[in-house]
Structures are given as structure tokens and as C-alpha cells.
A protein has these predicted regions:
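Intrinsically disordered, low-structural-confidence terminal and linker regions
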Residues: 1-55, 59
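Cofactor-pocket helix-loop regions in the catalytic cores of large enzyme subunits
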Residues: 3-27, 115-403, 417, 428-611
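N-terminal amphipathic, basic-rich helices that act as targeting or association modules
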Residues: 28-32, 44-98, 102, 131-135, ...
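Low-complexity, highly charged intrinsically disordered N-terminal segments
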Residues: 83-129, 139, 166
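A terminal-accessory region detector
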Residues: 405-407
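Surface-exposed loop and adjacent secondary-structure segments within mature catalytic domains
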Residues: 411-415
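Metal-dependent catalytic core segments for phosphate chemistry
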Residues: 425
Length: 614
């Protein structure tokens, strides 16, 4: 049977009847808001400009200013507020990094509290710390390194949080301008299984529906996903959905507290007594998702609770799936899922009774060695019922960090060009004709492969735009050893990390970047629901920080001045015009000018009426 999250103990049941969740472990929204205001008291005016004019940098849900495209009202969450200080803090003292030994052992939170990186700095092997240099010296020295390094021995990595599409685009273009396809970004690490399975099955690599489809659908199922934590504003959508009669099911080993009951601070009733989110919890064992899904599908097919008309008109391979499911035995399925057949029947009955449904998944599904297969199972479940290409239905991978959807679409992957086009000789020739310079046609390193190459001594330059491999990849000691072997490491960032303090093979550089809000000519990000949104430039100058895309562009043309005219993208406006030409489904990006300007590529629903590119 499915479990009821809301009856775990008497104390919890009592707390739901007490105002503000007294006695419950829950976010203290109003207290924390006051704390955030105090932290930003030295720059409150700028903080307000960010909140009222900028696109949220907290997650991939997509809020422009304080409003969105799903429901009316003011939208603000603690994820966004907790990041506010990163955008308002003053510069780090110029001499703070002269001896980094004094900073060893400090947490990344403590390092961030030192302030913004404000000036280009370099640390040579054997030196105790970093010393300030001019931008001209930094560009000239790094340009010479790239000139003297075979392209196969240099690599670029781009983080996901806070990065705009312009930065993704320029990172991949600069890398390929300098002859390498070794470029990757953090978003691929999170949802590569989703991309692979969706491309293969549907011919697309993004959510098929919109957030509006949550409100009014019969059922939402969350697989390995915790939107209350990852996209807090989405709890407002779930509050509205519950009021409209939507049932919510969660398939996850752990009953996430925020998905059990959430206190939406902007809704009086919810702020007082909370909103019960999950109706049915299916506590699969870790890694048991595929077995559970196969059991559910086995019942659906056996009982003929499927949409045969949809399957016959819009899919192929059903007979093969039917045969495979019929051969599965219940004993192994129950053992692997960690749930008995009655639980799978309970889920199958929920699916049977839901004419419309949205299936949502996140990293609890993708971060397994069999992540692609798990996503495939979710897609198969949705196709069996025809939950595709129409209102109140969809297959939705939840993205975490802001603008991660744009990473692959801008081409900041080692295996795809802009538009998600695979790297091969034919596509490289076409992109070379568009760019006017030769684009490499060989697949590059992923982030993990970059570290492997560094460990073997096969990587001479590693250029990181944000990010911290020590905190995102397994075996941090091994990662640190590999990073220390790279001759030249460049850390383009707004803040200091412990990764940047590792001694380099020869040189380590710190290049101070502007935030997304300070970025010249504004910036664009793409949300989970494929909404391309403009965030205007909110001027502020911290030391000598430069816009991230400008740093990358300047380095590329300094390294290869003989083809500088072919680089283009002299401004953010010109770059967006180029993106519209190179990535046709982003046509319209060139017309975005102010807060609230946006478009949703593909419209509210991809695969309309079940017709997919495949």
C-alpha cells in the first residue's frame, strides 16, 4: 500500500492544527526574511533593484522581478533571498589573498564572506598567495598560453547557477574559436540521462508541458524530486493545484518534509496552517524506481488500463514492451522496488483514474548509473496513458539551478554544438561556414574526463567559469591531486572557492567577473518550462570586474588576433542576434529588451497532440 506522509506521528498531526506550524520543524520564512534584510543593509537599494527588476537566479522556475507566467501575485522565496548577498556584497580587500595559507581549512561559506573578487590576480608555483595584475597583463599572458598549447590539451568548464545564455554561448564559441571541443557545464552532470532518454524517445530534450498544466490536472507524480526545496515558488502552484482537486503522489525513498506539508508565506491560510502537498507516498528502495515503474506498467498493460488509440497512432515498439513486461516476475520486482505488488497496484489505480497527469522527475532519478533507463521507464509510463502534447498533461524534468536548460541549447557541451546539434564532421562544417572559422569536429571531454586527463598529465589549461569540482565530483582528494597537475588553471568567478586556492602546476589565475545582474547589455536565461526571459543590466561596478562573456571573448581574440574579425558578438545585443540565427528555435531572443520580456519556445506544449519529432 502507499503510505500517508501526514500520519507519521501524533505530534505532526497536532502541529498542522496550530498556527505557523508550531512544534513542527519547518522553514522560518518571516524570521529569515528579516535576517536577509539585515545582511544586505549596506546595499538595500541595489538589493531591491535586483528583486524588482531581475530574473531570479535561485532556481530554474523562472520569476521575472516579482512575477511569473503561471499564477498572479508576488513571488519570492528564500532560495532567491539567500543568494542576494552574493550580488550586493562589497569587494574583497586587495591584499586578502597574499598568503592563502592563512585561509586553509576555511569553509566555502567563510571564503565567500571575504567579499567579491575585484581584480585579476595570479599565483605562480611556490608562491604563498595571489598578486594583483592588470587586465592587459592577464589577457596577454593567458593568450600566449593558449597560443602555445595544443587545443586538445585545453578545456573549459561552465557552472550552472547564475550563468546566462550569453555566457554559455560565448564559452563554447571561444573554446571552438581556439580549436577545442573540450567544453562542458554543470547542467549536463545533472540531467544528461534525461536528455539522452527524451531525445531517443521523443526527439526533444525539454519538458513537454508548462507549469500551468499542474493546476487543474488530475494527478501529479514526483519521481525522485523535491520541488519544495529545489523550486520553492512551485509550492504556490501545488497549493493552487490542490485547491483545484489535483492529487499528488511522490515516489521517493524519503518522505521529504517540504513535500508533506509546506507553509506558503504569501498565502494567509497556508502561512498559518500549511498546505498538505502529498496525498500518496510510495517509499521505493534506493535505486528501486525502475522495478517499481515496471510493476506499475505490468499491471496497466495486463488490466488494459492504457490508451491503445494513442499507442497505435503515435508510438512504436509497444508489443516489445508488452512482451518484456509479461516476462517479469513479481518476486524480483518486489525485492528490487522495496515495495510489494499492492503498492504497485495502488499507483496503477491512481494512473488509471487520471485522465490527465503530469509526471515530474529530478536528480533522484538521474543520478544513478542507470539514470537513462529510469527516465525511459517514466517516459514509457506516460506514453502508455497518452500524457503528452495537450493541456494538463506532460513529461517534465525539473531543473535546479537557474538557466541550466540553456547550457546544451547554447552548445556548451563537449558533444553538441549550439541547438543541441551533435558534434560530427558534417555539423562542424556547417557551423564553420556560419562562424567563418574552422570548428573542430571531434567530441571533447566531459567534466569527469577533464579530471581524468588532468590526472594523467594530458591537460595543460583548465578554464573554469565558476564551479567547484571539489564539491561536485566524487573522490575530492583525487580531484584535488588532478587539478594540481594542470599547468595553468583559470578561475573566472565572482567569489573565492577552496578549489581556486589549490596550488597549480605552474600558474593559477583569478579573473573577477560581474554578476548576471551587472552583465553589460543584460542577459537571458531559459527556465524549466522553456521560457526564454530577459533580465536587464542593473549597473554596478565592483573593482575591475568584467562581464563574463566579455572576458571570454577578449581572451579568444587576444589569443588569435588574425581571425578576431570572425568572432563577432561585440555586444550582448549582437550576440543575441547571432544566437537567433544559429539556434532557430531561439528566434525572438533578439527582441527581448526589458524585465518581463519573454517567449516560450515550442509553445505551451511540445509534441502537440502526441506528434513528436521522432
Amino acid at each position: 500500500m502507499s503510505c500517508d506522509c501526514h500520519r507519521n506521528n501524533r505530534k505532526r498531526a497536532l502541529s498542522t492544527r496550530l498556527p505557523f506550524g508550531v512544534g513542527t520543524h519547518k522553514p522560518k520564512h518571516f524570521r529569515d526574511m528579516l535576517k536577509i534584510a539585515w545582511e544586505n543593509k549596506d546595499n538595500l537599494s541595489y538589493a531591491w533593484k535586483i528583486l524588482s527588476r531581475g530574473v531570479c537566479d535561485g532556481c530554474a522556475l523562472g520569476v521575472a522581478g516579482l512575477h511569473d507566467w503561471t499564477i498572479q501575485g508576488v513571488h519570492l522565496c528564500m532560495t532567491r533571498l539567500n543568494l542576494l548577498r552574493l550580488n550586493t556584497m562589497p569587494a574583497m580587500p586587495a591584499d586578502a589573498l597574499e598568503d592563502v595559507r592563512e585561509l586553509q581549512g576555511k569553509s566555502n561559506r567563510e571564503l565567500r564572506s571575504l567579499g567579491r573578487l575585484a581584480y585579476p590576480m595570479r599565483r605562480l608555483k611556490g608562491e604563498a598567495g595571489f598578486h594583483r595584475v592588470s587586465w592587459d597583463e592577464a589577457f596577454q599572458s593567458l593568450a600566449e598560453h593558449f597560443q602555445n598549447t595544443p587545443p586538445q590539451r585545453s578545456a573549459f568548464f561552465v557552472t550552472a547557477r547564475g550563468v546566462t545564455n550569453e555566457v554559455y554561448y560565448m564559452a563554447q564559441k571561444a573554446a571552438r574559436f581556439m580549436g577545442t571541443n573540450h567544453v562542458d557545464n554543470a547542467a549536463r552532470l545533472c540531467h544528461a540521462p534525461s536528455t539522452a532518454a527524451m531525445k531517443r524517445t521523443l526527439g526533444i530534450a525539454a519538458t513537454t508541458c508548462s507549469y500551468k498544466d499542474w493546476i487543474g490536472t488530475d494527478l501529479i507524480v514526483f519521481f525522485g524530486s523535491n520541488p519544495a526545496n529545489d523550486q520553492p515558488v512551485s509550492t504556490k502552484y501545488l497549493h493552487e493545484a490542490k485547491a483545484a482537486g489535483t492529487k499528488v503522489a511522490m515516489v521517493n525513498p524519503y518522505c521529504e518534509p517540504g513535500m508533506e506539508r509546506y507553509w506558503v508565506p504569501s498565502n494567509a491560510g497556508s502561512a498559518l496552517f500549511g498546505t498538505a502537498i502529498t496525498d500518496h507516498w510510495f517509499p521505493v528502495s534506493q535505486g528501486g524506481d525502475i522495478a517499481f515503474l515496471c510493476g506499475v506498467m505490468k499491471i496497466l498493460v495486463a488490466e488494459d488500463w492504457i490508451d491503445r488509440s494513442f499507442l497505435e497512432s503515435h508510438t512504436e515498439g509497444f508489443e516489445s514492451l508488452e512482451r518484456q513486461l509479461s516476462e517479469l516476475e513479481w518476486g524480483p520486482l518486489e525485492r528490487d522496488a522495496g515495495l510489494d505488488k499492492s503498492s504497485m497496484l495502488a499507483m496503477a489505480e491512481l494512473i488509471r483514474d487520471a485522465k490527465n497527469a503530469v509526471l515530474v522527475w529530478s536528480m533522484g532519478i538521474t543520478q544513478h548509473g542507470f539514470g537513462t533507463e529510469a527516465v525511459q521507464a517514466i517516459l514509457n509510463l506516460g506514453l502508455l496513458r497518452g500524457y503528452l502534447g495537450k493541456g494538463f498533461n506532460g513529461l517534465m524534468p525539473i531543473r535546479g539551478h537557474s538557466s541550466v536548460q540553456g547550457g546544451a541549447e547554447m552548445g556548451a557541451y563537449s558533444t553538441v554544438f549550439p541547438g543541441g546539434v551533435p558534434v560530427n564532421a558534417s555539423n562542424a562544417r556547417q557551423l564553420s561556414e556560419q562562424y567563418g572559422f574552422q570548428v573542430p569536429d571531434w567530441p571533447g571531454y566531459s567534466a569527469v574526463e577533464m579530471i581524468e586527463a588532468a590526472s594523467k598529465g594530458d591537460l595543460d589549461i583548465l578554464y573554469s567559469v565558476g564551479g567547484n569540482f571539489l564539491r561536485t565530483l566524487p573522490e575530492p582528494k583525487r580531484v584535488a591531486d588532478a587539478l594540481c597537475k594542470v599547468k595553468v588553471r583559470v578561475h573566472q568567478d565572482i567569489l573565492l572557492t577552496d578549489q581556486a586556492m589549490l596550488e597549480g602546476g605552474e600558474e593559477v589565475w583569478l579573473l573577477p567577473a560581474k554578476t548576471r545582474y551587472e552583465q553589460r547589455d543584460g542577459g537571458v536565461e531559459t527556465s524549466t518550462e522553456r521560457r526564454v526571459m530577459f533580465s536587464p543590466e542593473i549597473p554596478r561596478q565592483v573593482g575591475e570586474a568584467m562581464s563574463e562573456w566579455e572576458i571570454l571573448r577578449e581572451l579568444a581574440v587576444r589569443a588569435f588576433p588574425e581571425k578576431a574579425d570572425q568572432m563577432g558578438c561585440e555586444s550582448g545585443w549582437l550576440m543575441r542576434e547571432e544566437i537567433a540565427r544559429i539556434v532557430p528555435f531561439y528566434d525572438g531572443i533578439q527582441d527581448l529588451r526589458q524585465t518581463g520580456d519573454a517567449f516560450q519556445y515550442g509553445g505551451p506544449h511540445l509534441c502537440p497532440e502526441g506528434v513528436c519529432p521522432t
